[in-house]
Amino acid sequence: MESWLFLLGILAIAIVGKNKSLIIGVSAVMVLKLIPQTQNFLKLLQTQGINWGVTVISAAIMVPIATGEIGFKELLNVIKSPAGWIAIGCGVLVAVLSAKGVGLLAMSPEMTVALVFGTIIGVVFLKGIAAGPVIASGLTYVILTVFNLVPGH
């Protein structure tokens, strides 16, 4: 019962915040939860969902390359600019932080609750997008490391 109230609360916040992605996500999970035969799929979604999402995002990012909108010329031009190097550095940083964050979530699954809550606040009230839980867990890992608070260490 508690899980239903939690999901309904998130759905209500998503509706008030007019966040379509969160509305669809919560609704899909609620429908799956209603069907007893989908419990294994829910576990699979929990363990592999982020990987599936990253795959979809990666494919979307590749479309301009596939359509010819972006080619080697654009890559060379961006490498010549300070903004391009900053973007490359940020990409590297996010990849490393995400890897650390996934490790933190594996060591301390209860951290997921706080990250999800923070993500919901950011999505609904600050008009963010829910692509950040893994990055947020990476930032959390860095901060916890600085203060020597990483669970399991």
Swiss-Prot record:
One Pfam family in the UniProt entry: DUF441
**Transmembrane region(s):** 4-24, 52-72, 85-105, 115-135
Q: Does the keyword Membrane apply?
A: yes
Q: Which InterPro entries match?
A: UPF0756_TM
User: Which ranges of the sequence are coiled-coil?
Assistant: none
> What is the first-listed, main subcellular location in coarse terms?
membrane
What name goes with this protein? UPF0756 membrane protein LSEI_1366
Q: Which organism is it from?
A: Lacticaseibacillus paracasei (strain ATCC 334 / BCRC 17002 / CCUG 31169 / CIP 107868 / KCTC 3260 / NRRL B-441)
